[in-house]
Amino acid sequence: MFAQVFGTCTFGLNGHVITVEVDISRASPAFDIVGLPAVSVKESKERVQSAIRNSGYFFPIEKVTVNLAPADLKKDGSCLDLPIAMWVLAASGVIPKEVLASVMFIGELSLQGEIRSVPGVLSMVLAGREAGISTFFMSPAVAGEALLCENVTVYAPRTLGELVEYLLGHSPMAPAKRREAAESKLSDVDFAEVQGQIMAKRAMEIAAAGSHNVLMTGPPGSGKTMLARRITTILPPMTREEALEVTKIYSVAGLFKAEDIIRERPFRSPHHTISMAGLIGGGTIPRPGEVTLAHNGVLFLDELPEFPRAVLEVLRQPLEDREVHISRVNASFVYPSDFVLIAAMNPCPCGYLGDPDHPCTCSDGEIRSYGRKISGPLLDRIDLHVSVMRPKYSELTATIKGESSARIAERVAAARAMQSERLSEWHMQNNAQMGHRQLRETCRLNAEGSELLREVFEKLHLSARSYDRIIKVSRTIADLAGTSEIKPEHVAEALSYRNMLPRRS
């Protein structure tokens, strides 16, 4: 007897509809799964058999062959347990095949028949909806996630037996309902808490307005981490499309635990011991790494020179292309990685080079070696280099608070609105996304600004990439000033942020 049903699995960040075909034939008892299953899928044989028996149903003592189509796509994970079990029951006559038409089953089965959650449900349901499927069965633990998709009906039985009884019409089951979205909580940090650091806060404002990368250099305790953790408070809110994209990433990574869509921009701060795979993604079927988990948000790398140089070098492609490419034998994966990089470091191993109150104890060789841990090509991809010095006592004890995040966010939002309108023809949202064509058409300098940039370009022997990034930052500074013209003072300020690593004078 033959039957087929729909399941799904994730491949990278996207879901793929899988047709599960089951054939039961008169032969020596066997249970085989074909169609390029991974080890985790092959293990489902034991889970499915035990779940069916322990739910009170008969598992065929015949040859059971399960085919997972398309056969050229490697299937991974335990998400196909439930559809395999349902089609075995249909093929053996326990439930009518008709009730399984145009529905999709997603979930892992325990040995007792409990339906368990799996990561990536949002991507799976989106794939099913695109294939014309509107009814889904899954664990109650992930029903809320599935309901983030519009125009779908989700049922959430707790066990295999409960699901079969509903399909046979023996017991009722109401569709799962979407819970009311919780109100967005206010951030517990604010730029008003940062005393002094005028230039560093200005750099953060420019970074947020144009989505530019920042490197802060300063002694221990100068406030670099404090500044970095507050940048999300001035970034504009995510659009629904951006929020859905971030939610899908966290769902596939198994990090989505909420009932509502992720609305706050991600802030990722990996430790400097992270591996290359942890940063960009890895595995047989690669899972998202930190650069993808920071998509549409911020990636903060504290103590930048402490990261292995090989790990830092893999940042070059995502910083340039805003996506990361991972190749495997059977396929290539492209993950989004459009983030703002905020990096922080000490100026030397002891941390006090250039500090007027603490003498530096490092030798010239140690300082040079420390600076060489970060390659020139990586530094070239960082738009804003800012020195952060320890605040003075008078600044720390001042009763007048600094400018609030809300005030800064208003200026950032106005600048982003100008950029979005100016770049709408190319479907871009911010200045950092501009290419050569957009730079030529939207970022013309007057004669005075061009001459200033030419002098600095020739004196410092800047690269073409540095030239482009200076123009982009100048454009953002002009946007914050509310002017369509890039003036010499905007270019001058942008040039002031091209400082390289400090050296002993």
Predicted features by range, described:
Residues 1-215, 219-225, 327, 466-467, ...:
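Peripheral, non-AAA+ core regions of ATP-driven protein-machinery
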Residues 92-93, 169, 254, 296, ...:
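Short glycine-centered helix-capping/turn motifs at secondary-structure transition points
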Residues 136, 299, 383-386:
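Short, well-ordered beta-strand core segments
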Residues 216-255:
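Walker A/P-loop
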